Design a protein with these regions (language model features):
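Two-component system phosphorelay core
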Residues: 1-116
Length: 116
């Protein structure tokens, strides 16, 4: 696994590996689950539909997943979005989606490259 590729996408591979007690196989399995997870699509759909509760649930789930995988850039963005949603600042939370989408796409691309 090329940690430089991951680091460029805001993923601390060393920290993630430490969380997995050094098991690269476990980390790879969880990275694959991240790629298959539907919460980003659910977040986008909920925002489009104005479903605030659904958006909060999806964003909060993504925050936890990214935290567990040491996806620091995404974790920070989702944390901010969840905080805004909980504070009732829906417009600002929605405005974060472009930045979140770019960081998410970077992370997906990096993980895919490392799993090839």
């Amino acid at each position: 696994m090329d940690s430089r590729i991951l680091m460029d996408a805001g993923i601390d591979a060393e920290s993630a590996l430490n969380r997995m007690m050094g098991s690269e196989a476990l980390l790879e399995r969880l990275f694959r689950r991240f790629l298959e997870d539907g919460n980003f699509s659910a977040l986008s759909a909920a925002i489009e539909a104005g479903d605030r509760e659904g958006a909060l649930t999806a964003s909060h789930t993504l925050k936890g997943m990214c935290g567990n995988l040491s996806m620091d850039r995404l974790y920070s963005l989702f944390s901010g979005q969840v905080d805004l949603m909980r504070a009732g600042d829906w417009e600002e939370a929605v405005n974060m989606m472009q930045q979140i989408r770019e960081a998410y796409e970077d992370a997906v691309s990096a993980v895919k490259r490392c799993l090839e």
